[in-house]
Amino acid sequence: MESSKFVKIIWVFGIWILVFTFLIIYNNYDYKSTFGINKFEKRSLKTINQINNKENGDDKKLSVFLIPHSHCDGGWLQDYDGYYYNIVQYILSGVVNELNLDKEKKFNWVEIGFFSRWWNDQNEIQKEIVRNLINNKQLSFISGGWVQNDEATATIDDVITQMTQGHQWLKDTLNYTVEYAWQIDPFGYSSSTPTIFSSMGIKGLVINRVSNDVKSYMKSVKEMEFIWKGSESLGEQSQMLVSTLNIHYDYPKHIDPKKDFSLNDRIKGFTKYLNDLSKTRESNILMIPLGDDFRYSNAKTEFSVSKEWVKALQDNKEYYNIKEIKYATLDEYFIALEDSFLRNNKFGKSRKQNVYTETFSDGDDEVSALSLYNKDFFPYSTGNLEYWTGYYTTRPLLKRLIRESSLLQKSSDILYTLAIGENSNNQIDINNLQTLSNQLNENRNTIALVQHHDIVTGTSRSFVLNDNFQRLQKSRISNYNIISNSLEYLLNKSNNKTNNNNNNNNKNNNNNNNNNNNNNNNLKNTNSISTTGSSSSSGSGSSNNNNNTVNKSEPFNFENAIDLSNESNNQYSLVFHNTLGWEVNQHVSFRIKVNKNDNQLLESIQLVEAISNKTIQIQIIPIQDDSNCQSIENNYIVFAIINLPPLGLNTYYLSIANSEDSKSNFTYLSKPKLLKKGNEINFNNNRFKVEFESNGLISKITDKNSNEIKTIEQTFHQYSTKKSGPYIFNVKGGKKHGFLENPDKFIYHDGPLVSQLTMLYGVDDYCNVTSIVVQRIYKNNNEINNSNSKSLITENYIETGYSINGDMNRETTINYKVKDLENDDIFYTDNGLESRKRIYNHDRSVNQNYYPVLGYIKLKETSENNNHQYTVYVDRSVGATSPSDGEMEIMIHRTMDTDDWKGVNWPSKDIGRSDAKLYFNMDLVNNQLQNEKRISLHITNQPIMFVKKHNNQTGYLLKYSPLSNQLPSNIHLQSLLTLKNNTVGLRLFNIHEVDSNTQSTTDTDKSTLFNELEISNFIETGLSFLKLTKNNLIDKFSTRINKKFPIKCGESEYSFINEKPSSIIFSNNGTNNIIDGENKGENNKTIETIQIKPHEIKSFTFNFNFQLDQIIPNNNNNNNKYAINKELNNEYIEQSIENQRYEYDFSFFPIKPTFYDDRGKYNRPNHLALILSLSIGIPAGILIIVIALVVTYKKRKNRKTLTSSNSSSNLIQQEDQTDYSP
């Protein structure tokens, strides 16, 4: 019996061993988690790993960097305030508490807008904890922008602004400088990103949303880490080390705290994930994101779950072939990655390598190299024809308002900065102006906020977009106020230090009086406004220094329409501000309102340039002609050609003459001419002759410079689809239809300055017109000196304005088709810094060939006999393509009642009206190399006009420029703004648009930058105005170009890397100290030469020289009659301006966004239920019908049979009753 039991035990034990072995081998059973690993097993594993490491090298062991983070959108499904109060404040408080309790824990934070708000809510104890966490390198800031910006629809100016706002706050508040970036949610990536970020001192970048097929390829060839070159012209200067996330920025599945896995399953799944991940990388340095959207709202729970499996892996690193695994900052990861690449010359440069070939040699040994990528990552696709190209255009009105508000912010920054500089010797004025600084910074924060990748893209819930629209309105009103007060402090001569220098500048002032139009030097010492509108010739530049009274009840205001009704005894000062660093001669337009049918008054309107007392030509066009539409009744457009000094101001008087015989020879009132067809007229100016089809759209253009005649087919179209959404443009199952093909009315206006053809569609009542198209060409009446020698910049394009509503389930385009143009499917789009090459792929549908456009799209002829370029400039971000040779297609509006289920979970129902303009140019390629960027900058930096009704005002400057001369033609003054402590920030951009008669190097040593503003501490900085740092590692990497990479276009159009940089010479007039980037300088006259490469943006900071010995003391007895009156301006503007503002001069309707309340859950159509219902319902219905027919048939047959039977019975009965008797 005992032997029998023993045998059974042996059998059971043997079977158990076999089963256990089977589980280990075939089911990957984790026996160590059941029994643990004893010392013998650990020694055995250690021995095995030592053998493996000896064979493969210790570098084969994995270094795992766990990156805790929370992706906090600045608006998406909730608005900014909602996210902060409901989630973000708890995330930050919880994370800080957890990090403070455990020094091993780390956290990475991106969105400084949220963090700064949270910081302001904390007490000093909590703030000190944060400082300690930063010092302990537990809390890290990555990217450091105010938000995480979009890369397709945000302009480079706005991207730089939002990054600068974050970087400046971090430096000022926490003395923190960001070194690595985390762009993990934008829907595709622009090549401008590595250029901009590297110029800010950022050394490495993490990206995520790369198209599925591209990312799969990158994994297969181990190119998830690569060097990204943003610009061919800048070379290594624009390069950055990039690491791509494996799948997404969320937790890997098995370690997600929200997933219900046991510890064993977590470890087993995660280690398998690590093994798979390592096969896609050249390095054994692995980065694992621990987070997702708005994670760590319960930081204690999230950290406790991860702490458990991290500890288990740390205790058994040898077994899992892990060198280290830990919570980490992004800085730690990149430092380890860089070290791994450079260690043992793995990716280091050798003496004999060629960095642009695929193979490198060092003697007989092959040296590996990192992939060098020189394109962008557009469009973004998630497969199944899901191309994220719709958001390039989604919410076109919002995109325009953001760009428009950004320009207003730029004007506000410039004028405030100059007002500070001009009043630097008056403490009272400085104190008054500085009360505006907080407003100014808050307005910048608003511009920064709307660059978020779900705001400027239009891909948030509608109520969220409405919240941002309201923020933009508020910032505009605030900027109106800042500009208004800055103008007072700039132009009121007794209010700045100009008068203190008058005696030293009489000679210059007299020269200016003798040559008003040609000399921009010393414009601050010009004449003052007088009550008669004439100019004083006083050498001191003041008509009456003892009577400098200012009517503060009438500030400089932004006006929608200047009301000239019953104002014959008054005149207006129109002050135009030029935000460009070049002198501007161009057409401008503004609205006026007069009494009904008062042609005599209209013909008596005069516009006089104040500085020269010279009446200039104007042309007046009515906005409506024959209706009773009250909203625009008696509204007119006034056109004029004005001259503006670089970065400066010029004043014009708008008045009505008193005399009955006051008809002005310089005022042309255009009478409307109703046409039956659009081809009854042509347009002509110095540059072009334009002919039209019968429907009023462009048909032919003649370039008078080259005598080239081209047939241009201009058309509107609409795609109909039910598969698109806020993000996705999907033409599958849809059709392309003609749109705006037959206008109901043609109205033609002509004159000396403008030819205009207006087409109206859907006209029942003029007020209810559905769509408007306005064709316009600008003409030069030779009022500007030297205008005969060169066309005005506004003459270089044909302008097409349109006003259309969003049609449901329609995506509207405008197309330009150049006949007989061979461009070999190649076209170019502007990314804000430079043009990028695109190739239309005919194997893909049109939506897969759309690309983002910030400034323009263009075609170039590739045939040998032609060298023409065709460019369409845009006024906002759009999507565009070239679907056939010679054709440019631009999407201008889209709306749908379906969602694409990419997270918004609500349809993008944008039925609102969008008023916009496009600008068509044709020219020689060489001419456009010089002009295209300048034209684009002029279009997006239109002069800003402010109005003052003046009566008994004296002592005002009439013309002003802070620059002694305009900047070289290829140097764009991108930014001038005041930072903290009155430090001034300056950015200069070499757009490489050089004069055809000059070389690429521009030398401006004959001038200084600023006219009389004395500056000190001139320092070159990074792009966000922090200390200039160079990435010393980037030029140590060996690189190669993978010609098999699946993205085949997106590279720079031109490379100017071998051309010399432009030279800008700064002088400090021999009075102050100018210090270069290395903090060298002398206290005497210093000349500073700045070299700016083509396509490079350089940044500087400096201080205005506050002359303390001349500062007026601030005391209570001083009567400050120039005190800022912010309340008045705000009240005026809020009530009469911003709420009833027109987008363009031709607009019939005020701006009216169509936002709606889409909070909560959207009831998604149940397509499966519909299919099942139809699948079951249709056969069932047919069956019921068949049954009914059969039953009916049988009933009828039975009834017929019964009737026949009854008839037979009756007949028999009758026969039986028949009398046969004779």
From Swiss-Prot:
Protein EC: 3.2.1.24
A GO CC term attached to the entry: membrane
Key words, A-Z: Glycoprotein, Glycosidase, Hydrolase, Membrane, Metal-binding, Signal, Transmembrane, Transmembrane helix, Zinc
Example GO BP: mannose metabolic process
Subcellular location field: Membrane
Principal location: membrane
Molecular function via GO: alpha-mannosidase activity; carbohydrate binding; metal ion binding
Biased composition (Polar residues): 1212-1222
Cofactor annotation: Zn(2+)
Family indicated by similarity: Belongs to the glycosyl hydrolase 38 family.
Record-given protein name: Alpha-mannosidase D
Organism, as annotated: Dictyostelium discoideum (Social amoeba)
